[in-house]
Amino acid sequence: MKAVRLYEHGDEKVLIWEDIPLPEIKEDQILVKIKAAAINHLDIWIRKGIPGISLPMVIGSDGSGVVTELGRKVDKFSIGDEVIINPLLFCGNCSSCLENKENQCNSMGILGETTNGTNCEFIALNPRNLIRKPKSISFESAASFPLAGQTSFQMLVNRAKLKKTDTVLIWAASSGVGSFGLQIAKLYGCKVIATGGSKDKCEHASKLGADLILNHYIEIPRLEELQD
C-alpha cells in the first residue's frame, strides 16, 4: 500500500510517498481503508522533530474510512461500516482508563506520533479507536475533527465542567482547537469571547457564533474593561 513516511526530520521534502506492506490485523483488531486524512498542526511538529519520535514513521493523526477486515474476536463492527478514527491510544484497563480519563493512561499514545498514523491506504486499529460515522457527515469532515475536537471537549466539558451560565474566552478561536472550543461552548449555551490575529480570523470566529470578538494583537486591553 502507499503511505507518507518520515525517515528524517526537516521541511516538506522529508515526506516520502512510498510503498509499504499492508498491515496484518491481530485477532482483536480491525483493518480500515482510509478515505480521508486531515492535516493537523501536530503533523508539522512531528515532521520538524519536536516530539522526538522514533523513525521511520507513517505520519497523520486524524482520519476516517471504511472497515474492510475484522479480527476473529471483533464483534462490535461489520465490514463496510463507515468510521471515524480516534487518534488517542490507550489500554482501556488502567485506573485512569476505568475513570474515563484515557488521556492520562499509563501507556497513552497518539497515532502518527508514537505509532504509525493515518497517512496511508490502510490502518489496523483496536475497536476502541473507531466511532461509527454518521451518514450525514462526509469522510472529509469526519477526518477533520478527532484530535482538535477531543482536545477542546476534554478541556471544556470534562475538566472545566462547562455550564450555561459560563462566559468563555477562546484564544485563537479560528485555530483547530479554538474553533471546536467555540462551537462546543455555544452548544452548551455559554457566552463566548473569541480572539483572532487578523480580520479574516475574527470574521471566521463571528461565523462560528462568537458573542464578542477581539483582535488579540491590538484589542486585548479591552479585556480589563469587560471584567469591570
Q: Model-predicted segments: where are they?
A:
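Nucleotide donor/acceptor-binding cores
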Residues: 1, 165-167, 191
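Glycine-rich beta-strand-centered segment in the early N-terminal region that forms part
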Residues: 21-38, 50-98, 134-136
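Cytochrome P450 core scaffold surrounding the K-helix E-X-X-R motif
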Residues: 42-47
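NAD(P)H dinucleotide-binding glycine-rich loop of Rossmann-like/cofactor-binding domains
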Residues: 89-172
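Adenosine-nucleotide cofactor-binding segment
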Residues: 170, 186-228
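N-terminal Rossmann NAD(P)H-binding glycine-rich loop of SDR-like oxidoreductase domains
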Residues: 174, 182
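Residues forming the Rossmann-fold NAD(P)(H) cofactor-binding site
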Residues: 179
